[in-house]
């Protein structure tokens, strides 16, 4: 039995010789946060910086005057002076798109010999966005 005892002791010895984890081997995300206040502050600063970045991204705004559906053969007959009748009435508000997504509606205005649009309605989902920092 002494041989069996020795073998089991040798196994214990071999197990104890296994590599002890170092700082590099430990996943720091699994350890408790020492400075949770600093971490929260850093996260808040990151969010504010991200918000500033997003709010400064340029976008394309398109105002849709109207739509019409015609055949290609009719389009090919167009020449200078041809008129295309649109489906929308002049009394209907114009759709305003941001990067292809409907965001608002409004009415056409002329300012200093340029077209403009007076916003008459903003899509509900956009009204809830807080842009103040």
From Swiss-Prot:
**Assigned keywords, A-Z:** Bacterial flagellum, Cell membrane, Chemotaxis, Flagellar rotation, Membrane
Matching entries from InterPro entries are given as: FliN (IPR012826), FliN-like_C (IPR001543), FliN/MopA/SpaO (IPR051469), FliN_T3SS_HrcQb (IPR001172), SpoA-like_sf (IPR036429)
> Organism's domain of life?
Bacteria
GO terms of molecular function? cytoskeletal motor activity
Biological process annotations from GO: bacterial-type flagellum-dependent cell motility; chemotaxis
Positions with biased composition (Basic and acidic residues): 1-28
Primary subcellular site in the record, as a coarse category = membrane
One Pfam family assigned to this protein is: FliMN_C
Q: How does it sit in the membrane?
A: Peripheral membrane protein
Q: Mind telling me which GO cellular component terms the entry cites?
A: bacterial-type flagellum basal body; plasma membrane
Q: Is DNA repair tagged as a keyword?
A: no
Where in or outside the cell?
Cell membrane; Bacterial flagellum basal body
Extent of the signal sequence: none
Q: Which SUPFAM superfamilies match?
A: Surface presentation of antigens (SPOA) (SSF101801)
> Is Oxidoreductase set as a keyword in this record?
no
Q: Which residue ranges are recorded for the region named Disordered?
A: 1-39
Family under the similarity heading: Belongs to the FliN/MopA/SpaO family.
Q: What does this protein do?
A: FliN is one of three proteins (FliG, FliN, FliM) that form the rotor-mounted switch complex (C ring), located at the base of the basal body. This complex interacts with the CheY and CheZ chemotaxis proteins, in addition to contacting components of the motor that determine the direction of flagellar rotation.
Specify the protein name.
Flagellar motor switch protein FliN
Q: Which gene encodes it?
A: fliN
């Amino acid at each position: 039995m002494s041989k069996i005892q020795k073998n089991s002791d040798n196994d214990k010895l071999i197990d104890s010789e296994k590599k002890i984890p170092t700082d590099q081997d430990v996943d720091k995300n699994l350890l408790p946060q020492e400075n949770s206040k600093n971490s929260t502050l850093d996260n808040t600063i990151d969010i504010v910086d991200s918000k500033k970045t997003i709010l400064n991204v340029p976008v394309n705004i398109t105002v849709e005057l109207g739509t019409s559906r015609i055949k290609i053969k009719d389009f090919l007959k167009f020449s200078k002076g041809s008129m295309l009748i649109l489906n929308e009435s002049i009394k209907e508000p114009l759709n305003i798109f941001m990067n292809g997504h409907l965001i608002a509606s409004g009415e056409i205005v002329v300012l200093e010999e340029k077209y403009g649009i007076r916003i008459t309605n903003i899509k509900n989902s956009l009204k809830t966005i807080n842009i103040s920092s």
